[in-house]
């Protein structure tokens, strides 16, 4: 086995190379990463290496041999597959690692994200929904010193940026969202999809699933005439549906 292949072969299902393939297959079946769209990157906390899904690979068929591995310090590729080129998302993944101290980033072409980007303006908003409690608030508990989640009564806000012809051209707007929304763990790209990050791949996956649930719910609320961020008790005032 070559020194490059050692980086991607492990019997541990939680090894980044194995996890990326497992999750990409799962996300394909969730209809989030079809037609080679989307991608995942995970930072190995033991080595400080970035593992990155390549461009142009069918996500449900991806294997560890298809992955790129990059040194987090030098940003040099330690391993490059012969059949694929680096993902166009790579500069965006690196920005999340460097500016948000992310441990993993998920990019999907979720239809819920795309629809929400057409319905909302500069930001997606939803409030007073239980699932919001799965999303980090960006604040730290003064007693436990642990990160705090949003509460049921909080409003989740996710910035929406305009799509570009090439994904690496999104970098300036992504940096702007880091400044304007310092507590966000996601950004929606209009008519494109969503990027979600977290301190670990487990957290990023939870955030991504919760946000997609909330976006789907917001779409259904919008179809009923209910503003997704409306106050508790105000829902029936907005209903388009006739009373039974």
UniProtKB/Swiss-Prot annotation:
Compartments it resides in: Cytoplasm
Pathway annotation from the record: Amino-acid biosynthesis; L-methionine biosynthesis via salvage pathway; L-methionine from S-methyl-5-thio-alpha-D-ribose 1-phosphate: step 2/6
EC numbers, comma separated: 4.2.1.109
Cofactor(s) named in the record: Zn(2+)
Organism of this sequence: Saccharomyces cerevisiae (strain JAY291)
Any one annotated GO CC term: cytoplasm
NCBIfam families for the chain: salvage_mtnB
Residues annotated as binding substrate: 89
Pfam families in UniProt: Aldolase_II
Record's protein name: Methylthioribulose-1-phosphate dehydratase
Gene3D superfamilies: Class II aldolase/adducin N-terminal domain (3.40.225.10)
Keyword vocabulary terms for this entry: Amino-acid biosynthesis, Cytoplasm, Lyase, Metal-binding, Methionine biosynthesis, Zinc
Function noted in UniProt: Catalyzes the dehydration of methylthioribulose-1-phosphate (MTRu-1-P) into 2,3-diketo-5-methylthiopentyl-1-phosphate (DK-MTP-1-P).
Active site: 130
